[in-house]
Swiss-Prot record:
Main location: endoplasmic reticulum
Record gene name: GPI10
GO biological process, one term: GPI anchor biosynthetic process
Presence of the UniProt keyword Cell membrane in the record: no
Entry EC number(s): 2.4.1.-
Pfam family for this entry, one: Glyco_transf_22
TM segment ranges: 17-37, 96-116, 123-143, 145-163, 179-199, 221-241, 269-289, 316-336, 342-362
Alphabetized UniProt keyword annotations: Endoplasmic reticulum, Glycoprotein, Glycosyltransferase, GPI-anchor biosynthesis, Membrane, Transferase, Transmembrane, Transmembrane helix
Taxonomic lineage from the root: Eukaryota, Fungi, Dikarya, Ascomycota, Saccharomycotina
Subcellular localization, as worded in the UniProt entry: Endoplasmic reticulum membrane
Gene Ontology molecular function: alpha-1,2-mannosyltransferase activity
Family the UniProt entry places it in: Belongs to the glycosyltransferase 22 family. PIGB subfamily.
Protein name: GPI mannosyltransferase 3
Length: 510
């Protein structure tokens, strides 16, 4: 069980060779992941980092509004600068290097899930917690991607390992480390504060050293926030409070729903199965066994809190994964030995198959097309005539040439009435594709990017989804009249929840 009282045993020290194997496993994971999941993997970390290091790239509206911490792009820019100094900044290496660094960091998530299980559960459960973490389909698909949520999960796993769960036996040195790392995770994702608020309240209520715990919390959180404020000030060039701007955007202006809303119970019936995949039945059993433990209660509180927010995404509760994997490990040890081997490997196989498909097949065309455009000599300019942020950008293209895509900024500064009728640029295109291309582009392909009076121009290479060919053939006819020819195609997906992104990715070139 997830005991409040810590367990002392050999698993608290992990052999160096095991760490190397886990790190190598995650590097292989990162380098073999060929698909696209969500735009933030590129646009909120690698893209601003690329702009900072190389002087070109695109900053989305979040950066202009000061909603994001500068820590992720600063780390990325450091990687890119190192490549420059070593003379290794060719497109392929520029794409691979951040993956390797993220993979090494991600491996700490596996290690500290193991260590946390060893500390709170025991030597029987700890190896299974590591096993579940390594053979988790969602971990394989998501953990090594450059999302702030991935870093948030790793930092949460590390901080939990240092946390004091027994108020009667508080280790203040370890608690100080936990608070420091937990505060950094909140800088990356402010909503992670929900988890730490629940755990902190439990600790304060159960310890006799209340004032000392509170003082440690205030000191460490203030130290982290002061340091990151200074770093953000240097990055933005002016006083910026990303946390306050984040709260203003999501709570006061309530604009997050512009990017979609989900039913109240989404996290229970969809997100939890996505996070656990084949391990779901064991996870639910383990959570039930440990329903009285503070970590399980904290996880439930986080899910309930997120359920009250209209805009929901599975990655928002990703920091709970170590707790879910520990629950699955608990259930495995409770399974009769005669059934255990068959059950565990059957569920592991489900995870392996799901991980393979979604990391190798589903939505790979939008990544492949950018890698193709980055190396094709005849490419002098690029346009992405598809929903906004459908592909990586300069972090993968790595060519200082004119590039555009259809934008989708939210209605910031609009009245409630204006928000109801607001249509972003991508919406305007799909409302009437032919009219859009006839009115928003220069009349002739002879008009260069520099000469065009609008942000959109006729590029040498234009990427679209196959669905546009099928649903708006008149647009294709117009492109052909301008001199475009159908070129390379890239398989993207067998199915998609957005009709605009259905089918292959097709390149048209002059």
């Amino acid at each position: 069980m997830m005991q409040h009282k810590e367990i002392k045993h050999p698993y608290q020290g992990i052999k160096y060779t095991v760490l190397v194997v886990i790190a190598a496993f995650r590097v292989a994971n990162a380098l073999t992941t060929k698909t696209f999941f969500q735009p933030d993997e590129y646009w909120q970390s690698l893209e601003p980092a690329h702009r900072l290091a190389y002087g070109y790239g695109y900053l989305t509206w979040e950066w202009h509004e000061g909603l994001r911490s500068s820590l992720p792009p600063l780390v990325g820019a450091g990687i890119y600068k190192a490549l420059q100094l070593l003379g290794l900044d060719d497109p392929r290496i520029v794409r691979i290097a951040p993956k390797i660094v993220m993979a090494l960091f991600a491996s700490a998530g596996d290690v500290y899930t193991w260590k946390l299980s060893a500390r709170l559960q025991g030597p029987a459960e700890a190896p299974w917690a590591l096993f579940v973490s390594l053979l988790s389909a969602f971990n394989w698909f998501f953990l090594t991607r450059t999302f702030s949520n991935s870093a948030e999960m790793v930092l949460t796993a590390v901080a939990l390992n240092y946390w004091s769960f027994n108020g009667k036996e508080v280790n203040f040195k370890r608690l100080s480390v936990a608070l420091f790392i937990g505060a950094i995770s909140c800088v990356l994702r402010p909503t992670n504060a929900i988890l730490w608020a629940v755990l902190g309240l439990h600790l304060v209520l159960t310890t006799t050293a209340k004032m000392r715990v509170l003082w440690l919390a205030v000191r460490n959180v203030a130290l982290v926030f002061a340091a990151t404020y200074y770093i953000d000030y240097l990055y933005y060039g002016e006083p910026v409070f990303p946390l306050l701007n984040f709260l203003k955007f999501n709570l006061l202006q309530s604009l997050a729903h512009f990017y979609g809303t989900s039913p109240t119970l989404y996290y229970f019936y969809e997100a939890l199965p996505l996070l656990t995949v084949g391990w779901l039945p064991l996870t639910l059993w383990g959570l039930w066994i440990n329903r009285s433990q503070v970590l399980v209660k904290a996880a439930l509180a986080v899910v309930v809190a997120f359920s009250l927010i209209r805009h929901k995404e599975v990655r928002f509760i990703y920091p709970l994964v170590p707790i879910l994997h520990m629950a699955a490990a608990e259930a495995i040890t409770q399974t009769p030995k005669k059934l255990r081997k068959w059950l565990v490997w059957s569920l592991a196989l489900v995870n392996i198959l799901v991980a393979g498909y979604f990391s190798q097949v589903h939505q790979r065309g939008v990544v492949d097309v950018v890698e193709y455009l980055s190396t094709e000599p005849q490419v002098t300019s690029v346009g992405f005539l598809m929903p906004c942020h459908s592909t990586p950008y300069q972090s993968h293209l790595h060519r200082d040439i004119p590039v555009w895509f259809l934008t989708c900024e939210p209605p910031i500064g609009f009245t409630a009435e204006e928000q109801m009728t607001y249509r972003d640029q991508a919406d305007q295109f799909y409302d009437d594709p032919l009219q859009f291309v006839q009115t928003q582009f220069p009349e002739s392909v002879a008009v260069s990017a520099r000469e065009a009076r609008t942000p959109l121009f006729h590029p040498s290479h234009l990427a679209i989804f196959e669905s546009l060919e099928k649903k708006s053939p008149e647009v294709i006819e117009h492109l052909v009249e301008l001199g475009y020819k159908r070129g390379k195609t890239f398989f993207n997906s067998h199915f998609h929840d957005d009709w605009r992104r259905e089918g292959d990715v097709v390149v048209y070139n002059l």
